[in-house]
């Protein structure tokens, strides 16, 4: 059963859209809280959510501020309303609290994709007591050019205002990825090797929009917090952490950077950290050709850990 609702953000009162898929039969195994990536929306995760629901998992996802239905106007897509990373994390926290209130007896598995993978790590840095397992999907490796991106975003914001859409930062961030797959003749080819998925993404008004400087500053702050492992509270060191990514994902940079990302969570204090790369897959492994194997592997891992 699909359930849709919304809540007012504790950060600024913005209406945040939420969707849940509830299995038809009890008992439920656990709750999976999903956190989506940049320039997309929660409905893109319905196939994965349906798969998990059939296995007995309650699955909950919300639209980030400035995404999907969590906007005041359609023109606000890619604008975070000045709340920055902190407001995004507060929204994740609110959903997390609501889940625990509705299902106090169930374990909670937190999973984030791409930008969402940065957000979930920034979240557990302070709130890992609220999470029983963490799944990090399509994680961007730490980008040493981030300070330059921050400087550009701040300068553009000061000159043009927070709603200015930064084509410069967009090109700096994703231009290399587009070039890597230029033979596919799609600027979004780095997202997925399935041409139908790439085409649908390009044609959707809710996908692929250019971030404002306001949103880029939030993104950069999420990356900073996700990789600042020295400041993780790590009150739940036995929490299992699974990293899954496509080996051809340009956000990964390379295998060495992926391994470094996995090690970073171990340095943060977590004892049970595993990483898996999928050959031939790009950024959106949940939408890739062969995604059924990814779904299966994630489900097997959750069950192996007792969820």
Task: Give short role names for the model-derived ranges.
Residues 29-32, 36-40, 114, 247-248:
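Active-site glycine-rich loops that stabilize anionic/oxyanionic intermediates
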Residues 44-75:
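Conserved alpha/beta-hydrolase
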Residues 268, 272-307:
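Catalytic active-site module of serine/aspartate enzymes centered on a nucleophile-bearing elbow/loop
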Residues 120-206:
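Alpha/beta-hydrolase-fold enzymes
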Residues 243-245:
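Short beta-strand/loop motif that positions the catalytic acidic residue
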Residues 1-24:
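N-terminal cap/lid segment of alpha/beta-hydrolase-fold proteins
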Residues 103-114:
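Alpha/beta-hydrolase fold nucleophile elbow
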Residues 80-100:
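Alpha/beta-hydrolase active-site loop
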């Amino acid at each position: 059963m699909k359930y849709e609702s919304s809540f007012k953000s504790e950060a600024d009162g913005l209406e945040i859209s939420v969707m849940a898929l509830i299995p038809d039969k009890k008992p439920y195994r656990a709750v999976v809280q999903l956190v989506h990536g940049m320039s997309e929306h929660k409905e893109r995760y319905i196939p994965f959510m349906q798969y998990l629901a059939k296995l007995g998992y309650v699955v909950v996802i919300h639209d980030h501020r400035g995404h999907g239905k969590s906007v005041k106007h359609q023109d606000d897509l890619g604008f975070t309303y000045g709340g920055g990373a902190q407001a995004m994390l507060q929204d994740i926290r609110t959903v997390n609290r609501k889940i625990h209130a509705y299902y106090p007896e169930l374990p909670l598995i937190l999973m984030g994709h791409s930008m969402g993978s940065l957000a979930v790590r920034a979240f557990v840095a302070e709130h890992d007591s609220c999470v029983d397992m963490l799944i990090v999907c399509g994680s961007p490796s730490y980008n040493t050019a981030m300070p330059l991106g921050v400087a550009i975003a701040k300068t553009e914001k000061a000159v043009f205002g927070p709603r200015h859409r930064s084509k410069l930062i967009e090109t700096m961030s994703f231009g290399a990825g587009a070039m890597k797959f230029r033979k596919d003749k799609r600027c979004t080819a780095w997202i997925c090797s399935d041409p139908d998925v790439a085409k649908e993404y390009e044609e959707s008004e809710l996908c692929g929009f250019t971030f404002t400087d306001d949103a880029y500053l939030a993104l950069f702050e999420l990356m900073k917090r996700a990789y600042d492992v020295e400041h993780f509270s790590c009150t739940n060191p036995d929490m299992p952490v699974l990293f899954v990514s496509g080996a051809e994902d340009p956000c990964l940079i390379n295998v060495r950077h992926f391994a470094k990302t996995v090690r970073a969570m171990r340095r943060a204090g977590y004892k049970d950290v595993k990483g898996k790369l999928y050959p031939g897959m790009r950024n959106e492994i949940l939408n890739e050709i062969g995604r059924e194997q990814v779904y299966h592997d994630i489900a097997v891992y959750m069950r192996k850990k007792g969820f």
